[in-house]
C-alpha cells in the first residue's frame, strides 16, 4: 500500500461485469511489530472513538475449550512487556494507557467471521489486562464497548486472479468482492448510528439470529452445493448452480429443511434472502 500512496483497487464483480473503485481510506499505515508506541498512543487518544478490528480468528488467541485467553508464548511475551507481538497486546496496552490518561468511552468493533466476535474480543482483552491491573480490567469490562457484529459479503482469494481482472492494471493490494454486502451490528448506540451511516449497515438487537441465517442459508447451502456439484463433475459453485439437478436440490433443501427451522425476527425476509443467496452463487468470480 505504501508503494501506491495508500491507494488500492476494489473490484466489485457481478455475474457479467466488473465495477472498479479506486480507494484511499488510509491516512497513515502503521506496522504492529515496529510502531507499537504510536499504535498505543492512538488507542489512548481521547479523540479516538471507534476502532475496527479485522485480524482473522487466530489473532484473538482465544481458547475455545476454556473460553478464555490462551496463554501461549506470544501472549506471555506481551504480558512480560517485551516487544508487542499480538493484537490483544496492542489493544490491552492502549486501553491501559487510555485509562490512565482520560478514561473516555470507546467502541472496539470486531469485523471478523467469528460468532459472538465482540464478546470474545472483550474476554481476551480483559483477561490480558487482569494479569496486569485488575482495576483497569474492571473499567474495561464496564466501560469499553465491544459490539458483536456480522459481515455478509463473499471476498474471494486474490492469489490467482481472474483474467478479466489481471488485464485491467497492476495493483499489489487489490480486493475482489461481490456486490452484495451487509454489516450487522448488535448495538443501539445513537453515537454509533451517527458515525456509521450506510444503507447496508444495520443495527440490531440480536446478532445471533443473523449469524444463524448466514450459517444455515448461505454457508451450509454453499457446502452442500459444492459437494453435490463435485460428484456431478462440476469444478465451481457457479457451474453447479446452473445445473438444474443441483439447483432444484438446493432450492428444496432451503425451502423444506432450513427455512422452516428459523424463527423469523425483525421482519427479516428469509425467502428473499434465499433468493439473493442463490443469485450470489451464480457469480463466477
What are these regions (language model features)?
Residues 1-285:
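Substrate/ligand-engaging "lid" and interaction regions
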Amino acid at each position: 500500500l505504501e508503494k501506491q500512496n495508500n491507494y488500492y483497487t476494489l473490484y466489485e464483480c457481478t455475474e457479467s461485469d466488473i465495477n472498479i473503485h479506486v480507494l484511499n481510506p488510509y491516512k497513515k499505515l502503521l506496522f504492529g511489530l515496529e510502531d507499537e508506541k504510536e499504535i498505543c498512543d492512538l488507542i489512548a487518544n481521547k479523540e479516538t472513538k471507534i476502532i475496527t478490528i479485522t485480524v482473522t480468528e487466530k489473532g484473538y488467541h482465544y481458547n475455545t475449550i476454556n473460553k478464555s485467553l490462551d496463554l501461549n508464548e506470544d501472549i506471555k511475551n506481551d504480558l512480560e512487556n517485551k516487544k508487542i507481538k499480538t493484537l490483544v497486546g496492542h489493544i490491552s496496552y492502549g486501553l491501559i494507557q487510555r485509562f490512565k490518561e482520560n478514561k473516555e468511552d470507546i467502541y472496539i468493533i470486531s469485523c471478523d467471521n467469528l460468532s459472538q466476535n465482540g464478546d470474545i474480543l472483550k474476554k481476551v482483552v480483559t483477561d490480558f489486562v487482569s494479569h496486569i491491573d485488575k482495576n483497569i480490567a474492571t473499567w474495561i469490562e464496564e466501560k469499553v464497548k465491544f459490539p458483536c457484529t456480522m459481515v455478509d459479503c463473499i471476498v474471494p482469494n486474490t492469489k490467482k486472479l481472474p483474467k478479466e481482472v489481471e488485464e485491467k492494471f497492476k495493483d499489489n493490494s487489490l480486493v475482489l468482492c461481490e456486490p452484495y454486502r451487509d454489516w450487522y451490528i448488535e448495538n443501539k448506540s445513537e453515537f454509533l448510528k451517527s458515525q456509521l451511516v450506510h444503507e447496508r449497515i444495520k443495527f440490531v438487537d440480536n446478532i445471533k439470529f443473523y449469524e444463524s441465517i448466514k450459517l444455515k442459508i448461505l454457508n451450509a447451502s454453499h457446502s452442500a452445493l459444492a459437494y453435490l456439484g463435485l460428484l456431478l463433475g462440476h469444478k465451481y459453485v457457479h457451474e453447479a448452480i446452473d445445473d438444474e439437478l443441483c439447483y432444484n436440490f438446493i432450492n428444496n433443501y432451503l425451502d423444506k429443511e432450513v427455512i422452516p427451522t428459523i424463527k423469523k425476527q425483525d421482519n427479516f425476509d428469509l425467502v428473499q434472502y434465499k433468493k439473493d443467496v442463490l443469485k450470489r452463487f451464480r457469480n463466477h468470480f
